[in-house]
Amino acid sequence: MTDLTSLTLAEARDGLAAKSFSSLQLTDAHLAAIEAARVLNAFVLETPDQARSMAKAADAKIAKGEGGPLEGLPLGIKDLFATSGVRTTACSKILDDFTPPYESTVTSQLWRDGAVLLGKLNNDEFAMGSSNETSCFGPVVNPWRREGSDAKLVPGGSSGGSASAVAAGLCLGATATDTGGSIRQPAAFTGTVGIKPTYGRCSRWGIVAFASSLDQAGPIARTVRDSAILLRSMAGYDAKDTTSVDRAVPDYEAAVGRSVKGMKIGIPKEYRIGGMPAEIEALWKQGADWLKAAGAELVEVSLPHTKYALPAYYIVAPAEASSNLARYDGVRYGARVNGRNITEMYENTRAQGFGAEVIRRIMIGTYVLSAGYYDAYYLRAQKVRTLIKRDFEECFAKGVSAILTPATPSAAFGIGEKGGADPVEMYLNDIFTVTVNMAGLPGIAVPAGRDSQGLPLGLQLIGRPFDEETLFSLGEVIEQAAGRFTAAKWWI
């Protein structure tokens, strides 16, 4: 039998339908792969008993011809999604052994469609990070290595566990979240596909909040088709989320393979940043050439406020985080560190419960919202955000179907290599991705090549609001031209 962990999600779905193997066999293969790859630290909680139980139930449904769109397919869930009866910590000590009595909307829709839970995936603490090094469970290791080196690399963040697990063949797909690039950057670092849908496309209910006006759930998978299949199950209106949009969910998979002839693809001049490696520039041109060869028209566009996006993002996101994280105080749930009085208990709990990066962002957020600085920082950042959104609107109004950019300014870097002395060095990793969140647009990262050391590099496509279908069509063109990327399993 084929190695079941090497299958794409679409291939596994078709194999189950053809009864080539059972969901239990598929699930057991992935559970064994997870056990063998613990050195990657991708999973923070494994749920083998629950997985096998769900797989058996799926097999019974498939036998009766009653299977859902994801029936029997084993997935990993980022530890930001509440899973009823299964520990959910956001990879923070402050949530300790918190076990929610409720299910997030996104995961409940995955279970509704028949998916199998393999366990919870590592992420940066409260999704704050670009390398998955801030987790209280320790850093995640990228399954990719530089040629001729055994140095451990980061998988990107904050959804590093999701990207690492998918790239290593530990699950067929994974949920992730994206506040400033946390789906697309890890996907680019690991040779996987990640899509951040339009803001409001997937419900945020039951997902631990970082920055509520920026957070959006999406999938990380091995192929564009797999991402499309997963997004269809994850998306949909939810009355429990006031920012959820009541709009029909299309058949995203049908867009994969659709012709892109005649589409206008914008190439934004502002994304040619100083110091960008020649390899990234060459990859960007290669991607544009592939789309042109498929019949698309390339046009240079201007997004003049791009240069202000990163500083504005690092004002807006911490401001929202400082408000959202005020609820963690040791009173009702999570960790509690006692003190001589209630105020000291709050202080002790938060000081010991939150990690250094989370504390830094809470402090930045509190500072920019304080009386003397609100107008100078937060209000200005929100005005910049409006201008960034307007840049995209004007671009799309000229008939541009999508915008092509690099996904990251570099390939994956070493664990402990960046941000130690200067956190801004780490924040610069988000330079190509934050504009998408600030404008609430959909963006997809697709593997497009490798650097001189053999590490995967990705390209990003940015779409019009609620036009994820065009991104899947264009993404598949790049995927077909570039081929698929698979990491060698050095950990076995």
Curated annotation (Swiss-Prot):
Keywords: ATP-binding, Ligase, Nucleotide-binding, Protein biosynthesis. InterPro entries: Amidase, Amidase_CS, Amidase_dom, AS_sf, GatA. GO terms for biological process: translation. Pfam families: Amidase. It catalyses: L-glutamyl-tRNA(Gln) + L-glutamine + ATP + H2O = L-glutaminyl-tRNA(Gln) + L-glutamate + ADP + phosphate + H(+). GO terms for cellular component: glutamyl-tRNA(Gln) amidotransferase complex. Coiled coil: none annotated. PROSITE patterns: AMIDASES (PS00571). GO terms for molecular function: ATP binding; glutaminyl-tRNA synthase (glutamine-hydrolyzing) activity. Signal peptide: none annotated. The active site is at 78 (charge relay system), 158 (charge relay system), 182 (acyl-ester intermediate). Disulfide bonds: none annotated. Its EC number is 6.3.5.7. NCBIfam families: gatA. Belongs to the amidase family. GatA subfamily. Allows the formation of correctly charged Gln-tRNA(Gln) through the transamidation of misacylated Glu-tRNA(Gln) in organisms which lack glutaminyl-tRNA synthetase. The reaction takes place in the presence of glutamine and ATP through an activated gamma-phospho-Glu-tRNA(Gln). Heterotrimer of A, B and C subunits. This is Glutamyl-tRNA(Gln) amidotransferase subunit A. The gene is gatA.
